[in-house]
């Protein structure tokens, strides 16, 4: 079989039997939609940066805390996600408000900005601000590129 737009390019012994089948009919134009980039776009209004994370299908609201060495999730949030903290390891934590007793548990998976992390040890402790479920610390943030675009009023969190 030989396809060409120039009959002279067909070898001479085969030209007499060549059949003009015409040009193919172009199909419909289908716009190519690029896949969404990995990561999360977060509205930014100049205040604390908040991000959604998922544990066991339950969405949690976490404050991005570049000053926190470890990720902390509240008792209530872990209970909503079905995480048993009774076998956790007792630890002492030190924060801006002083020292406190806490617990470390391992969560099987944390979905964040298109990335699946885990198992992941997290600190379990209460927070004064009950409108958030925890603090996203550097132990997790180190696996992401965080970019704040104040002029565009958004931040991005992209897995590295």
Description of each model-found segment:
Residues 1-160:
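Pepsin/retropepsin-fold aspartyl endopeptidases
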């Amino acid at each position: 079989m030989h396809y060409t737009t120039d009959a002279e390019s067909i070898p001479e012994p085969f030209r007499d039997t060549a059949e003009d089948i015409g040009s193919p009919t172009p199909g419909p134009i289908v716009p190519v939609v690029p896949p969404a980039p990995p990561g999360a776009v977060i509205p930014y209004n100049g205040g604390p940066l908040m991000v959604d994370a998922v544990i066991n299908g339950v969405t949690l609201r976490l404050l991005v805390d570049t000053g926190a060495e470890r990720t902390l999730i509240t008792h209530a949030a872990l209970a909503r996600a079905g995480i048993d903290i009774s076998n956790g390891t007792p630890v002492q934590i030190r924060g801006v408000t002083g020292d406190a007793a806490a617990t470390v548990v391992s969560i099987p998976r944390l979905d964040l900005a298109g990335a699946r992390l885990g198992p992941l040890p997290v600190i379990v402790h209460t927070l004064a601000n009950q409108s958030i479920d925890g603090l996203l610390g550097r132990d997790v943030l180190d696996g992401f590129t965080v970019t704040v675009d104040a002029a565009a009023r958004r931040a991005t969190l992209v897995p590295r």
